[in-house]
């Protein structure tokens, strides 16, 4: 109902007001790019949820948490279909889900509320803002985050110790989805380690997942490359490939 839905909206919009004050009124710079502005506003919903939960108000906290999880679920069902850095207002629900998942990951690894403050109180924007606040390159952040989205808690990796950068340190996403009665929607496409072709068209800062299975105890060498239509040279700038060996 309205009384349950509106409080997260108020927290979200209040962060936009804070952000506007910090950038436009205090620092005399333009507003933040859409994707990062929305990510920070969704992070504000999280902060209120955490404060409510600390007071024992679990039902009220869940009202804040569930909307971010619903958007995240839409994104994780097809992470190759939405851009993290989409800039067409107001942004799709899938893009908002990606943005919340990304800022949640960053805050868990790079300073929590101090990171959120640094991203808000600055003259930098977008990718430059994130890389300056974290001290990491954009490519490395995307690579680590993309692995964490699937690998953290994956049943296929039971018993495997992951590097911390491949995990969420501040939320168990799979448990949260289960708590609200939903299965974790992200799963890689299984592929046998032999000649294969994977075709897709991906927007910027999006990803697809493949799980390669090698036969026997001594798998053959793996050679991967990007190609355009009918094997023509790949023309798009900046393709990125991340490999996680699970056995």
Task: Indicate residue ranges for each PLM-predicted region.
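Zinc-dependent metallopeptidase catalytic helix centered on the HExxH motif
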Residues: 1-67
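Arginine residue identity/basic-tract feature
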Residues: 4, 23, 27-28, 53-55, ...
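Glutamate identity and glutamate-enriched acidic tracts
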Residues: 13, 32, 38, 45, ...
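An almost-null, non-specific background feature
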Residues: 15, 19, 23-28, 45, ...
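A broad "ordered helical/assembly scaffold" signature
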Residues: 17, 50, 72, 191, ...
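Active-site-proximal alpha-helical
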Residues: 73-151
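Beta/coil-rich, acidic/histidine-enriched accessory regions frequently appended to metallopeptidases
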Residues: 125-247
């Amino acid at each position: 109902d309205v009384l349950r839905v509106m409080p997260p909206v108020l927290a979200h919009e209040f962060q936009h007001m804070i952000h506007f004050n910090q950038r436009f009124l205090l620092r005399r710079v333009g507003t933040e790019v859409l994707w990062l502005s929305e990510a920070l506003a969704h992070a504000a919903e999280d902060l209120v949820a955490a404060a409510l939960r600390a007071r024992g108000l679990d039902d009220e906290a869940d009202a804040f948490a569930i909307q971010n999880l619903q958007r995240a679920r839409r994104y994780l069902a097809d992470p190759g279909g939405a851009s993290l850095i989409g800039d067409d207002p107001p942004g799709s629900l899938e893009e908002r889900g990606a943005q919340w998942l990304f800022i949640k990951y960053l805050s868990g690894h790079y300073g929590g509320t101090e990171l959120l403050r640094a991203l808000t109180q600055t003259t930098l924007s977008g990718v430059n803002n994130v890389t300056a606040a974290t001290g990491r390159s954009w490519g490395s952040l995307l690579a680590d985050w993309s692995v964490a989205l699937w690998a953290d808690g994956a049943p296929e990796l039971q018993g495997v110790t992951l590097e911390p950068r491949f995990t969420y340190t501040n939320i168990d996403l799979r448990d949260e989805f289960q708590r609200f009665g939903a299965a974790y929607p992200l799963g890689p496409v299984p592929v046998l380690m032999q000649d294969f072709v994977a075709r897709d068209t991906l927007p910027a800062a999006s990803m697809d997942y493949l799980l390669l299975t090698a036969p026997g105890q001594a798998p053959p060498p793996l050679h991967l490359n990007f190609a355009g239509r009918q094997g023509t040279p790949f023309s798009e700038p900046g393709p990125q490939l991340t490999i996680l060996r699970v056995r």
